[in-house]
Amino acid sequence: MEVEYDDSGWQGRAKGQTNPEETLEDNPQKTIQECLEKFLTPDYIMEPGIFTQLKRYFQSGGSPEEVISMLSENYKAVAQMANLLAEWLILAGVKVTEVQAMVENHLKEMILKSFDPKKADTIFTEEGETPDWLTEMIDHYTWRSLIYRLAEEYPDCLMLNFTIKLISDAGFQSEITSISTAAQQIEVFSRVLKTSIVKFLNNPDDVHGAIQECARMVCHGQHTYVYSQVLIQVLSQEQKGGFNMKRLSQEIIKYALQNNQNVTPITMALNGSAVYPQACQALTSMLTRNTLNPADITVLFRNYSGSDPPPIDLIRNPQFLELLVDALFRSGVKINPEHKPKYMFLLAYASAVIDQPAKKRPMTERMLNKEELKSTIQAIEKAHTICNVDQGSTELIAELQTLYNCIKYPVVGVGVIRWIENVVMEPSYFKLSTDSCPTHLAVLDEVAAVHPTLQQQILFLLIRLFESKQDELEILVQLEMKKMILDRMVNLLTRGCVVPVLRYIKQCCAIEDTDISLIRYFVTEVLETITHPYSPEFVQLFLPMVENEEITGTMRGEGDNDPVSEFIVHCKAHYTTV
C-alpha cells in the first residue's frame, strides 16, 4: 500500500507556491548540520526560532524522523517544571503575587548573569522584525526595569537600544532615569528631556529637585548639552513661559560649572555676543578663569555705559553675577576703590535695567528702561558699605533700618544672604553670640518676607547651620541654638515656604539623627501658628509627625481640647483620603 505524502507548503501555502523572499541554501549538508547542532541543545523546541530552523532543515532535505527524535530526547521541560513548582507553592499557601515575584526575580538574575549582547543582536538579523514577545515584555514594569539595567551595562547593544526606543514610544519615557541610556538616541532623549522640563514647570514646590534632575541629564555630554541648550534657548523666546525656560537654562549653566565643566564657549555662542567682540572677549576671559579683573570689568563698564550697549543677557550670566555678588558682599574681598563703582554699576545694570523690543519699530531695535538703575546702584553701595565692615550684632542694630530699605531690591537681598552666610558659618560665630536670635539671622527673616523667590536659598543656609557641628558649645547651648534655627524655619513656613520646610523635617524624622525634643519643639511651634483649612499636601507631610506618639505623646491631654488632638481630629474628619 502506497503512503501518500502531503507535501503542501509550509504554514498553509498551497502546493507549488514559493515565497519570493526565500532562497535555497547554497550548501544543504552544511545547513542540515547547523540545524542539528541547535536541535541537540536542551529544550530547543521551546526557542522562538524553532520554526525558522525547522523550515531551513526541511528545505535542505533533512529527515523528519531524525529531527523529531532529537527534539524529543533533548526536551528537558525546564520551563514546565518551573510552572509546576510555582503551582505547588501556591497550593502550599504562598501568595500568587509572591510566587510571581520569586520567579521573575530569579529569571532576571539569570538573564543579567548570562546576557550576551551579540546573541541579542542576532534576534533582529534572524527574524527581520520586532518579535511579538519583545512587544509584550515592555508592557510590564518588571521587564522594562531589566532592559534599563542591561542598557546601562551594554550601551552598544542594538537590540537593547531598539527596545529602549520601543519603551519610549509606548509612553514610559519618565521611567528612563539613566542618562547614558537616554542619550544614545535623539528621539528617546528628546522625550525624556521634555518630561523633565514639564516636571520643572509643574512642580513649583520642588523646583530645586526638578532642576537638579534636568541639569544632570543635560550635562551628561557635549552633544546632550548643546542640543538641550539650543532647544531651551528657542523656548525662552516665547512670550508665555519664556522666563521660566531662561531660568532653567541659567540653572543648567550653574550646575555645569559646579561640576567643573567648561561650558563658557557654548554659552557665548548661544547668546549672540559675537556682534560685540570687545564685551564678548572681556566676559569670556573672566568666565574661563572664574575670576574678575579690573581691566575686563573696565571694558564691560565702558560698553554698557555707552550709547549703544550690548544686550543685557550677555552679563546676565549666572557665573558672572555670582562673581560680582561675591566681590561686593563676601567678607574679606578687597576691590580697588577706583574700580568699585564699575562693579556696582554692572551688577545693578544686569538686575535693574529692562531690555525690550521698541513698539512699532523693527525687532532689532531695543528700548532700555533704566528708571531703577540709579536707585539700585545706591542701594548696592549702601548695603556694601554695611556688609564690608567687620561688626558684631550690637553694632549692626544701628544700621538695620538702612539695610532693610536696601533689601527691598532683590539683588541686594541676594548679596545680603551671601554676606550672612559668610559670617554665620564661621565656627566661632555662635560661641561669641549671646542673643536669643542673632541680628544676622533676624535680617534673614526680613529677606524672606520681602523676597519669596529667595526663601529656598535661605532654607538651604538654615539647613547647613542646623546640621553644622558646634562641638565647642555645651550640649544645652547647642539645643537652644538649633531651636532658634527651627524658629527661623517656622518663619519661612509662615511666609509660604511650607512644603520644602516640612519635607526637610520629615527627612530628619526618617533618618533619626535629630534629637526628638527638637522635632517636638518644631511641631509645637507649627501647631501654635497654623489654622485650617489645610492643603492635602500639608496634611500628608505634617499629620504623621503629629500622630507620632514619641513626638507628641507628652503634649496630649485627657480630652480632645489640646492642639495635637484638635489637629488630628480635624484632619481625620476632613481629609479621609490621606
From Swiss-Prot:
Membrane-spanning parts: none
Pfam families: TH1
Keywords from the UniProt entry: Chromosome, Nucleus, Repressor, Transcription, Transcription regulation
Record-level Gene Ontology MF annotations: RNA binding
Single Gene Ontology BP annotation: negative regulation of transcription elongation by RNA polymerase II
Major subcellular location class: nucleus
InterPro entries: TH1 (IPR006942)
Top-level taxon of the source organism: Eukaryota
Compartments, as annotated in UniProt: Nucleus; Chromosome
GO CC terms of this entry: NELF complex; nucleus; polytene chromosome interband; polytene chromosome puff; transcription elongation factor complex; transcription repressor complex
Region (Disordered): 1-28
Functional note: Essential component of the NELF complex, a complex that negatively regulates the elongation of transcription by RNA polymerase II by RNA polymerase II. The NELF complex, which acts via an association with the DSIF complex, causes transcriptional pausing.
Subunit field text: Component of the NELF complex, which is at least composed of TH1/NELF-D and NELF-E.
Family indicated by similarity: Belongs to the NELF-D family.
PANTHER family the record matches: NEGATIVE ELONGATION FACTOR C_D, NEGATIVE ELONGATION FACTOR D
Name this protein carries in UniProt: Negative elongation factor D
Phylogenetic placement of the source organism: Eukaryota, Metazoa, Ecdysozoa, Arthropoda, Hexapoda
